[in-house]
């Protein structure tokens, strides 16, 4: 896909996850210079760099640490002559619990990671994206369209971030910056695989049957189907697309 990738790099936040790592591969395979971040999984980051023959680079980054975010963005911008695209695919194992079961500490931890972390990223990257006339893509959840019980710790923060995405699109369009999101259904990779291995999981046969009943396309999604959508949104083919949330969910939202 022709993006006419401008000077600078594509920055993938959360590049060691199932979707994030596929974004790293997809953008690399389409000629972009890619830098990706990891929070704690250095071994997986090293594997991805080796897999792509050292042609991508990785740095450690904790989005909840504002000073670290500000410093890292500045360094990446300077060392790569700009950042033309930011893909935020960061995420972690979020407990599947009903609202009545969630303690205040867990709630605050998720809010700090997902909402405050995204704000730290957005607030310190907007000026950089103005310079490159760049694009921001946030990996969100199809739960925004059809709420799945027990998923509030994923859906509630992403609903807030979705409004931030719209705000960036509205406020920064005149400065050449676009902002969009991708609402994921069940993607057969990454966090979903880790959740399947947890004890007391929601993901039993009854859950599987209920999800399939809600899908127009009767299968789970693949990580590359998400990364290809991110590629489109970052490309010149989507130059007139901003403030939009694209479901990649097999029709779950219908």
Where are these regions (language model features)?
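Conserved glycine-rich Rossmann-like NAD(P)H-binding loop of the short-chain dehydrogenase/reductase
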Residues: 30-45
